[in-house]
Design a protein with these regions (language model features):
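Active-site glycine/GP-rich loop and adjacent strand/helix microenvironment
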Residues: 1-60, 68, 75, 200-373
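Short, flexible, solvent-exposed loop/turn segments with mixed acidic/basic and small polar residues
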Residues: 136-137, 197-198, 251
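Conserved AMP-binding loop of ANL adenylate-forming enzymes
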Residues: 163-199, 208-211
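Nucleotide 5′-phosphate-binding alpha/beta core
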Residues: 1-137, 144-159, 163-175, 227-234, ...
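Positions that flank functional sites
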Residues: 92, 154, 181, 240, ...
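Short, well-ordered, mixed-charge alpha-helical segments that flank or form enzyme active sites
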Residues: 156-158, 184-190, 242-243, 268, ...
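Conformational gate/switch positions in structured elements
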Residues: 142-144, 173, 289, 351
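A short secondary-structure junction signal
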Residues: 148-150, 189-191, 245, 343-345
Length: 373
């Protein structure tokens, strides 16, 4: 059976209604997800519990822990990664000083995509054949793409971060989510069931594939959303903004989901306002990149506090650069989780500002990316 069988729209409609909706959510969260986690030899739920414990701590304590983690990460990189062993060893860098003097971090040279491409395996702490790993290629929206290798622990942390952030936005694992993806001409229709289908069931997730944002394409998207009725929708803001404009023109307003999670490109204020008003949903923003995963999120559920930087996942900086317009600063990150390929002071290519407040670090004035279909 192929995934375009005519029975599936009916099954989608059925799974979006009670009591099937609740039964499916409970089965996904408490049966399918643990089974999938065990089959894939992942350890996500334990790391999710760690994140909940971490963010219950006062910010001053979290900041102290982040500084210790920063020093530990740099020390590990100097000991295990050939590139850092040579680069930082040549300047006599002492990572222990970071525990008491965070300004000393400025002595570490910035890491760029060019350096990652040039150095290759010299940025790895061990050969890829020695441990499970996940290869991720950057999209190239902020320069030429490069390859990042994640170890198992880092991949599990990245998955746990997404679950934690969505929980803060009001979405539990029992509630369904929908992801937007492009459909290209000539793409074959996949068979059903597949490994991806079980993965989606375990995560209580479905995908929606679209090829165009014309009136017919937007009508198809809206009809699918009405059938499935997900709690959270994840996609590019430009796509959902186009949908909001179409619904406003044809219906005035409409509601098919509770939360829109913006990702992949910069969401402008006018887009956020239109989406919230027309589609009658809460809008949450997040910032992430292939090199590091999700690094900032509207942890207050999109209620106005802004994107909070995840101090558990890395050290964040914003630095003035000569080529940045209007005094913007470039975002620079040091990753804490990925011991296979630790990135120290990595230049993201994105512009924004790191702002310290009483309750955390926040990402403001972001100038991001735009994706065209």
């Amino acid at each position: 059976m192929n995934a375009d069988h005519p029975i599936f729209p009916y099954l989608e409609w059925l799974s979006g209604r009670q009591p099937v909706r609740t039964l499916k959510g409970l089965t996904s969260a408490y049966l399918a997800y643990p089974v999938a986690e065990r089959m894939e030899q992942r350890q996500v739920r334990g790391k999710l519990a760690e994140l909940h414990r971490h963010y219950r701590k006062p910010f001053a304590e979290r900041l102290r822990l982040a500084r210790q983690q920063l020093a530990d990460t740099v020390a590990f990189a100097m000991q295990a990664v050939p590139y850092y062993k040579d680069t930082l060893g040549s300047i006599g860098f002492d990572p222990e000083r970071l525990r008491t003097d965070i300004g000393y971090l400025q002595d570490i040279p910035l890491l760029t995509k060019d350096i990652i491409r040039e150095q290759g395996d010299r940025l790895l702490s061990r050969p890829l054949a020695e441990a499970p790993h996940f290869t991720c290629k950057t999209g190239g929206s902020t320069g030429l793409s490069c390859v990042i290798e994640y170890d198992q622990i880092a991949a599990d942390h990245a998955a746990a971060v997404v679950l934690y952030c969505r929980k803060m936005a009001g979405k539990s694992q029992r509630q369904s989510e929908l992801h937007f993806a492009c459909r290209f001409p000539g793409d074959p229709v996949p068979p059903w069931p597949s490994r991806e289908d079980f993965k989606c069931f375990a995560m209580n997730r479905s995908n929606i594939f679209f090829g165009a944002l014309d009136a017919a394409g937007l009508d198809e998207i809206w009809a699918t959303l009405q059938r499935r009725r997900p709690y959270l929708v994840h996609g590019h803001p430009s796509t959902i903004y186009a949908l909001a404009c179409h619904i406003e023109k044809t219906q005035g307003k409409g509601k098919a989901f509770a939360v829109f999670e913006s990702s992949g490109e910069l969401m402008e204020d006018y887009q956020r306002k239109k989406i919230a008003e027309v589609l009658q949903c809460r809008v949450v923003n997040r910032y992430g990149l292939a090199e590091l995963g999700v690094m900032a999120y509207d942890l207050d559920g999109g209620r106005g506090q802004g994107m909070q930087l995840l101090d558990s996942e890395g050290w964040s900086e914003s630095l003035a650069t000569d080529n940045a317009p209007d005094g913007h600063q470039e975002l620079v990150f040091t990753s804490f989780r990925n011991r296979l390929m630790p990135l120290l002071r990595y230049r993201s290519g994105d512009l924004g500002r790191v702002e310290q407040r009483e309750n955390g670090l926040f990402l403001t004035d972001v100038v991001g990316r735009l994706h065209d279909i």
